Amino acid sequence: MFRGHKLNLQRYYEGLCGKALFLAIWAADCDKVVIENPTPSKVFDFPPHTQAIQPYEYGHPVSKKTLLWERGVQPLVPTNIVIPNANCHEAGTWFMKGGKERQKNRAKTFPGIAKAMAEQWGTL
């Protein structure tokens, strides 16, 4: 968001729009709500998350913290804990390489996490 100690106004605006969408979903008149998001910038002052999960808790040997905001459901239970051998923040790992796929890779939902969500919350 900041480059050279200057605020990138476009990214800040997009972050504010993202927060507005988040808050609209969180405030929805629904008994059960789950929102998944990477750790947001502190400048946006999101409400506290209810759970932090890692891909390595669901069978993927990668460290990439993802936050969950849950209401009306039980916390997601790890299904296949493995030892991580890659971190999305380490220079040179597959996860953060530049190029056309970088944004897509950073937004990736790991299949093991999606499967756990479907199996644990899909019948609610």
Annotate each PLM feature.
Residues M1-L124:
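Conserved active-site and SAM-binding loop architecture
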